[in-house]
Amino acid sequence: MEKIRRGYYQGINPDDFSEVGTVIRLFPDAILCMDTALRYYGYSDRTPGDWHLAVSKDSGKSRFKIDYPFVKPYYVEPAVLELGLTTGTMDGHAIRIYDKDRLICDCLRYRNKMDKEIFNKAIQKYIADPEKSIPKLMEYAGPLRVKKMTKDLIGVWL
């Protein structure tokens, strides 16, 4: 057994150890977002050093102060937390993750906190993605307060 944090233990079998398994057990209410989701969808070729997690702004802050795995929480209004939520699979584990359209809205929202190269590549790959949904993107942009920016930045490419 390995102690992850006070009250959190994990059995170690080198064959079935997965960092994503640890993250989803520690933070079952969290949603993968930003750099982690960009990597999942292939919009970024960089592997993030931290797990980027969206959580309710009402959730406790201290639970994210752990030594491993490295996590970067994004505190989101509860009203829009589950907007664009979908599920996926990573390393054999079911994950909660934002869909591509919500992800791009978040990138626009946090563009000043992101690496510019990652931001630009994410936008370009989204535009080239045949599975993108511009109506859904615009639907999410309203409640996330990035509608004008979405029209200005994404509209140029269409």
Which role fits each region the language model picked out?
Residues 3, 8-158:
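Nucleic-acid-binding surface
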